[in-house]
């Protein structure tokens, strides 16, 4: 890939403040783009207003700026892209590739998250229903730049999946595929918790005629109880005054060498060195890293 053709992105959800796990993901994405003089875009995945936290959008932008992770172009907000999502849902539904589903959560208990196709041929009206995409009985596979080959049988391991919820909100799988294609994203660097989402996205890309980006899934930082760092587990928000030591810690989480002398450097100086020395092949080929190992 030539320097000018790389387009990466970071796409946080404004349901809370950025935490250390967010920093590791943002830093990996930023470095992978900047190391080849590529572009790095910022997209706010704000498709679920009930989960949004007041003030989180601005706080995320300010934190990234203070940590030196500057982006290219305007910030894209998924909440302003509903017309594009609606057009594709309509198209898929009218082509018979998607259908209305009125199954409740209670009805789906016991299926281990794999949709059994209860509404597949029922012909329900769209009003008040979720919209599911029909999946083929095929294996989708790709080679991740860190995790190696990954494959998933969509029919057996996932089942027909939701692209629009019953409340009218658009599902992550649909929005992320449409926005990555619209923005011309060539490389996706994100947490390994999304590894098993990727085959669904590959299918949507194929269905809609989009190019497949390269993927790099980094290990998640996990707490002693095995849960990933996240807003739902009250992970502490990033502190601006600790930017340099936290950047160095994030680099260690990504398997990168760090110089102790950089502890007295500015965030910009840390990033300048890290950008020159970026080695994605040094990232551990595993899906989790205990936070305690990074101290």
Curated annotation (Swiss-Prot):
Binding site for ATP: 231
Family annotation (InterPro entries): Glu-Q_tRNA(Asp)_Synthase, Glu/Gln-tRNA-synth, Glu/Gln-tRNA-synth_Ib_cat-dom, GluQ/Sye, Rossmann-like_a/b/a_fold
Enzyme Commission number(s) from the entry: 6.1.1.-
UniProt keyword annotations, A-Z: Aminoacyl-tRNA synthetase, ATP-binding, Ligase, Metal-binding, Nucleotide-binding, Zinc
Coiled-coil blocks: none
Pfam families for the chain: tRNA-synt_1c (PF00749)
Source superkingdom: Bacteria
Sites where the protein binds L-glutamate: 9-13, 45, 172, 190
GO molecular function, one term: ATP binding
Sequence positions that bind Zn(2+): 101, 103, 115, 119
Family named by the database record: Belongs to the class-I aminoacyl-tRNA synthetase family. GluQ subfamily.
Full protein name: Glutamyl-Q tRNA(Asp) synthetase
Top class in the EC scheme: ligase
Role: Catalyzes the tRNA-independent activation of glutamate in presence of ATP and the subsequent transfer of glutamate onto a tRNA(Asp). Glutamate is transferred on the 2-amino-5-(4,5-dihydroxy-2-cyclopenten-1-yl) moiety of the queuosine in the wobble position of the QUC anticodon.
GO biological process: glutamyl-tRNA aminoacylation; tRNA modification
Cofactor binding, per record: Binds 1 zinc ion per subunit.
NCBIfam families: PRK05710.1-3 (NF004314), queuosine_YadB (TIGR03838)
């Amino acid at each position: 890939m030539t320097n000018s053709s790389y387009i990466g992105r970071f796409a946080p959800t404004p349901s809370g403040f950025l935490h250390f796990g967010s920093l590791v993901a943002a830093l990996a994405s930023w470095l992978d783009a900047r190391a080849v003089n590529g572009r790095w875009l910022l997209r706010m995945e704000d498709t679920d207003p009930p989960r949004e936290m007041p003030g989180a959008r601005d706080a995320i932008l300010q934190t990234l700026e203070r940590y030196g992770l500057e982006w290219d172009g305007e910030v894209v907000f998924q909440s302003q892209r509903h017309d594009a999502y609606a057009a594709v849902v309509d198209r898929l539904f009218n082509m018979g590739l998607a259908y209305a589903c009125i199954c409740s959560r209670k009805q789906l208990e016991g299926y281990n998250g794999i949709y059994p196709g209860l509404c597949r041929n029922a012909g329900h009206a769209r009003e008040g229903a979720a919209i599911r995409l029909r999946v083929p009985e095929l294996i989708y596979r790709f080679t991740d730049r860190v995790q190696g080959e990954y494959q998933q049988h969509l029919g057996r391991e996932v089942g027909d999946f939701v692209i629009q919820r019953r409340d009218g909100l658009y599902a992550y799988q649909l929005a992320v595929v449409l926005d990555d294609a619209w923005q011309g994203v060539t490389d996706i660097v994100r947490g390994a918790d999304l590894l098993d989402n990727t085959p669904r996205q590959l299918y949507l890309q194929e269905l809609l005629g989009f190019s497949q980006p390269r993927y790099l899934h980094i290990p998640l930082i996990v707490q002693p109880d095995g849960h990933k760092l996240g807003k739902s587990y009250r992970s502490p928000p990033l502190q601006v005054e600790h930017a340099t030591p936290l950047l160095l810690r994030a680099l260690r989480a990504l398997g990168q060498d760090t110089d102790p002398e950089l502890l007295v450097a500015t965030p910009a100086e840390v990033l300048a060195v890290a950008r020159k020395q970026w080695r994605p092949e040094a990232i551990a080929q595993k899906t989790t890293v205990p936070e305690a190992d990074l101290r």
